[in-house]
Amino acid sequence: MELTAKPRTPKQKLDESMIAAVAYNKENNVSFALDRKAFDRAFRQQSTTGLFDITVEGGETFPALVKAVQMDKRKRAPIHVDFYMVTYGEPVEVSVPVHTTGRSQGEVQGGLVDIVVHNLQIVAPGPRRIPQELVVDVTKMNIGDHITAGDIKLPEGCTLAADPELTVVSVLPPRLTAEELEAEVQAAQVAGLVAAGELSEEAAEAVLEGDASLEEVKAEASEDNAGTDSEDNSDAQ
């Protein structure tokens, strides 16, 4: 996509309709200004993986990728753009968005697909061969399964720049409801009381099956212990 830019000095103040920008690589550094509306339209279409042919008035034309966009947090509008100059036919490392397709087996079972890494670093064989996105098919994934960076099929000529063991997508178990969470906490408490000898296995089973509350069986256990202590004292006398 083509962008026309105006030359500027690094500290030059700009009109509100313009955005300050810089393009660079290891050898060059060029400061310029872009029409705000034109850049907004172009960036929505291209994002960070799209190639821009930037022509500076009275100067050169060069291909570049968006490296970073500095935003005005209050106005939610870009105030500065960094471009990275690239060369046609030369490999370029880029961050490509990851998206999923399909409905996983884990989702059918109530699980949740979690995209852990939203952008993956790859090396494309040239600026014109950068994929717009990496699509991961999650159809066969079950709860507990995960897909690593090394599992993802890349377009021809592209190679992975990230750790191949990096988890990119996983399927999480269903989230517990408030009642399920309360039941898990209670089960842990009951197990602890049984292990400490403060609750019988019969009483624990009654609580877990809903036949009695934990407070009720604890009260009964206290009464039983009190009765046992009284009998022991009588025998001692």
Swiss-Prot record:
Residues 205-237 are annotated as: Disordered. InterPro entries: Rbsml_bL25/Gln-tRNA_synth_N, Ribosomal_bL25/Gln-tRNA_synth, Ribosomal_bL25_b-dom, Ribosomal_bL25_C, Ribosomal_bL25_long, Ribosomal_L25_dom, Ribosomal_uL5_bac-type. GO terms for cellular component: cytosolic large ribosomal subunit. One of its GO terms (molecular function) is tRNA binding. Residues 105-189 are annotated as: Middle domain. Residues 1-104 are annotated as: N-terminal domain. Residues 190-237 are annotated as: C-terminal domain. Keywords: Ribonucleoprotein, Ribosomal protein, RNA-binding, rRNA-binding, tRNA-binding. The keyword RNA-binding applies. Pfam families: Ribosomal_L25p (PF01386), Ribosomal_TL5_C (PF14693). Belongs to the bacterial ribosomal protein bL25 family. CTC subfamily. This is Large ribosomal subunit protein bL25. It comes from Deinococcus radiodurans (strain ATCC 13939 / DSM 20539 / JCM 16871 / CCUG 27074 / LMG 4051 / NBRC 15346 / NCIMB 9279 / VKM B-1422 / R1).
